[in-house]
Amino acid sequence: TGVSPISSIRYAGSPWELRLAEAQETLRRNGLRERVRLQTDGGLKTGLDVIKATLLGADSFGFGTVPMMALGCKYLRICHLNTCATGVATQEPRLRAQHFKGLPERVIAYFTYLVEDVRRHLAALGARSLEDLIGRADLLVEREDVPHRQQLLDLSRLKASASLPGAASHRAAPPIAAPPSPLAQQLLDEAFPELKAGRSVRREVRIDTQDRSLGAGLAGALAKAFG
């Protein structure tokens, strides 16, 4: 994140390509891949990044930094101080009023161009959708226009999962959904009809740690109803 030490940003963790390929191979070897949705994030920027992640086994993708930059983030790494100079990562009304210039249309434009880029790569590969390419690591080709030292790297393990016979390469089984808590179900039953009818709803309830996801079910129902 923007508040991480620079040493952590540069050196901590592993490239998502390596861990994604490893997770894909392990799940397929154990016959569990069809039960799991694999999501990857961290440095995804272009349609080609999405295609590569798909070929390595990703079902979905997370974007954080680039949409924030589309809203005006300058990556000043002071998010935790509540003094963001662009008004993006602050709750200070004065800073937001004076400096925040972000528009949702900019984020929409970014993802629109991203999707168009993905579509061009899909057409070049002769695929109709990303689902056709999930786990198709055999389609990855190593570049030859790289320095000699990089040519010495053995990247064959990145493609190992594609050669496993008979194992599912992406999620096929429906997700396992935990039943909502009684309070969450009560909120859904009481608030959803009112919100669907265009009326505002106000409720005061006592919650504890068992209701950490309170409101998620209602948000999902609204998303299904209104998109």
Model-found features: residue ranges?
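Acidic-enriched, low-complexity/disordered segments with a strong bias for Aspartate over Glutamate
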Residues: 41, 49, 59, 117, ...
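Alpha-helix initiation and N-capping motif
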Residues: 81, 115, 127-131, 152-155, ...
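Hydrophobic alpha-helical scaffolding
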Residues: 9-16, 43, 74-77, 97-112, ...
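Terminal amphipathic helices with adjacent charged low-complexity linkers/tails
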Residues: 127-182
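Glycine-rich phosphate/ribose-binding loops and adjacent secondary-structure elements
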Residues: 1-98, 215, 219-220, 225-227
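Mobile "lid/hinge" segments at catalytic clefts and subdomain interfaces of large enzymes
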Residues: 57-60, 64-147
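Non-catalytic terminal/interface segments that mediate subunit docking, oligomerization
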Residues: 1-28, 163-227
